[in-house]
Amino acid sequence: VAAPLDWNPEMSSALAVSIGNTRTQIGRIVDGTVQEYATVSSDTPTEALEQLVAWSKDIDKDERIVLLASVRADTADAMRSLVVDQIGAEIIELEQDLPVPIGRALDSESIVGVDRLLAAAAVWNELKQACIIVDVGTAVTVDFVDGEGVFQGGAIMPGTRAMLDSLTDSADLLPSIDYRRPDGEPFGRNTTEAMLRGVHNAI
């Protein structure tokens, strides 16, 4: 579905859905400004849909637009079907139907996660200067935008959950634990604290 020719992100209203590996963020945009937003689990797209349906009631049916960005195919597929069936909105998928407004200096065959591009575009739009963007989630990304507003790429590393799971899966005697920020002295005095300290310091 191509973006309507008269659709202007700075002047229009829309519903926005950003699907991450763990969490999904949804928002209601009015005249280019986010008026409301919520965060739900990416495992339960129907939870996000309930809020989107409520917001959509304030928008004329023939003017309903949902901006969709996703790094998780299964949830995106479910969300597309739900949006069409229950909201009747036109879906504009970022990068497929509408490019993220950020320059790129990448390999020609490179495929970059839309989440990284959106973060870079948002920071550039706010600062208009060279910057490093760190996004901590299921994965940790560290990206660079130069002084001309061009996304230069960056680095990707495991997030805290992925690091802890890797330790547990790879070493039989290491326990399965949840991440929390370690405090106190810099040395882990037991296995759990040592794991937490290692993961925390890695990031």
Give the positions of each predicted feature.
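Gly/Thr-rich phosphate-binding beta-strand-loop-beta motif of the actin/hexokinase/Hsp70
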Residues: 10-34, 123, 129-151, 167
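Conserved phosphate-binding catalytic cores of ATP/NTP-utilizing and phosphoryl-transfer enzymes
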Residues: 4-8, 101-131
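Gly/Ser/Thr-rich active-site loops/lids in small-molecule metabolic enzymes
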Residues: 150-174
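General beta-strand structural signal in soluble alpha/beta enzymes
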Residues: 91-96, 112-114, 132-135
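N-terminal glycine/serine-rich phosphate-binding loop of ATP-dependent small-molecule kinases
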Residues: 1-100
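A polyampholytic, Gly/Pro-enriched intrinsically disordered region
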Residues: 110-121, 175-187
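Adenine-nucleotide phosphate-binding core of ATP-dependent small-molecule kinases
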Residues: 38, 184-203
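Acidic-glycine-rich active-site phosphate/pyrophosphate-binding loop
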Residues: 89-101, 138, 176-185
